[in-house]
Amino acid sequence: MWFLFAAASAICFGLRGILYQWTSQRPIDRNLLLLGVYLSGTVIAAVINLFAGQPWSEGCWVGVWMGLFSFISNASMYRGFAVGKASLIAMFTGLPPVVVVILAYVLWGEKLNLWQSMAFLVIVFGILMIRYSNDISLRNLQGAQWGIITMIAFGITDLSSKKATMLGAATLPTLLMMYVTGSLLFGISWYMSRRRLASARAMVAAAAEDQEAESSPPAASANRGWSSSKTLFWGMFVGITNISGMMLVMPAFKLGVTGLVSVVIAMNVVFVLLYARFILKERFSRLEAGGLTCALIGVLILRLAA
């Protein structure tokens, strides 16, 4: 049963990845977008729990850690994309299951049997093949530190989800704590970035106040971006896929082995790859095709092992 929850979660996160990919081509404020994603999760979790009436417990406070490390992972990932090679950061985002397997063994003594280990390695290898790019080299690892932080933070987010289930925390209250924490952090981040942008614009305006003819092009450029309200509401729409996935993640971790659940969820990248191939008409490289095949073989081994 855990596999069905994890696979359904991967589909939801795959849809989220597709929406993120589409949104990345638009002139928007990413912090405001992510604020919308987490604000949507807050509202949906709160409303559903009004009817579901899931109980609150001390374990629900683990959701604060989930929100914190989710914020750190997203912030580090975007920072890595800004200062480093996109292909390198993308590769690190495929490695959190490795962190999860190692820490789950250290913390809780969880072990994989031979077939589970084989399936895990094949799936991780397939994910890395999909994310690998020929422009990655040992001589050019700029931004690698942000990729490592991203990898660890995503892994700890998964482990926090598992810990919440071990403490008997209900899904909706835990997610509500996670999304409230994330909303606050992304809201602060958006506010600070907006203040910095306003300060920079004021400096430019002061320097160019005697050149009125040259002050209109920047304004026209700014108008091409999405408005704050449009970005926020789009983020809230994307957030529906995010919380749908998270509502499936927690029962998957409750029923399954932590590392295996994490690696199945990480296969959401496959759906983004299929979207790029069949909707955007992008051709698979040999590595991507091989990685897709490996990942599917790994899932087959995992099902046979079960």
Predicted regions and their residues:
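Juxtamembrane helix-start motifs in multi-pass secondary transporters
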Residues: L33-L34, I89, P173-T174, V261
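Alpha-helical transmembrane segments of compact multi-pass small-molecule transporters, enriched
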Residues: S40-I44, F92-V106, L121-V122, T181-L185, ...
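Hydrophobic/small/kink-forming positions within alpha-helical transmembrane segments
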Residues: G14, I18, A46, G67, ...
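Hydrophobic transmembrane alpha-helices of multi-pass small-molecule transport proteins
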Residues: Y38-A45, L103-Y105, W115-Y132, L287-A306
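C-terminal transmembrane-helix exit sites in multi-pass transporters
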Residues: N49, M77, P97-M118, L128, ...
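Membrane-interface interhelical linkers
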Residues: M1-W65, A75-G84, Y132-I148, V180-L255, ...
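Selected transmembrane alpha-helices and immediately adjacent juxtamembrane segments
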Residues: W2, Q142-P173
